[in-house]
Regions:
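Acidic-histidine catalytic/liganding microenvironments
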Residues: 81-82
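Immediate N-terminus of the mature polypeptide
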Residues: 1-76, 87-153
Length: 153
């Protein structure tokens, strides 16, 4: 039996079996977290409390204040809407976990690179990487159990 289930996102309908598609366990948590992070407030369900709202940070410089605002907003949204994650155990790193830091590399003030590691209630970890290289373009990469989901912002 699955620990948690939800409607599959973004493909909510399984056309071959003429049913609503359902995700289970880690895929369910990944899809719900992805939906939560990529949604702007009032964009879905017309709820002002649902969604991290990353677009408001797109034209701002990569300062410690901006990173702190994004981190706080992600934790706040997980606390409100994601029951399968321990929000207080979320760990953030500035930069990408998979790349090594090159000494002397100048940080670009127009890019945000942040990785969050979430602990689920059933003992798995999810790694979320926000990589916004330019003010116009950005991607959210979600790594979990060997597969990666990338979404353009």
């Amino acid at each position: 039996m699955a620990e948690t289930t939800s409607l599959a996102f973004p493909n909510m309908f399984n056309l071959t079996s003429n049913q609503v598609a359902v995700s289970e366990d880690i895929a369910s948590v990944v899809e719900r977290t992805r939906l939560l992070i990529l949604t702007e407030p009032t964009e879905l369900y017309n709820n002002p409390d649902f969604g991290v709202g990353l677009k408001r940070h797109m034209w701002k410089y990569n300062s410690t204040n901006e990173r702190a605002l994004i981190k706080d907003r992600i934790i706040e949204q997980l606390r409100l809407h994601e029951r399968a994650v321990f929000p207080d155990r979320t760990q953030f790193t500035d930069g990408l976990l998979s790349s090594s830091d090159v000494p002397g590399e100048i940080e670009d003030p127009n890019s945000i690179k942040m990785t969050a590691v979430l602990q689920t209630t059933f003992g798995k970890e999810i790694s979320l990487t926000l990589n916004q290289d330019a003010p116009v373009e950005g991607t959210l990469t979600i790594n979990s159990s060997g597969w990666t989901v990338t979404q353009n912002l």
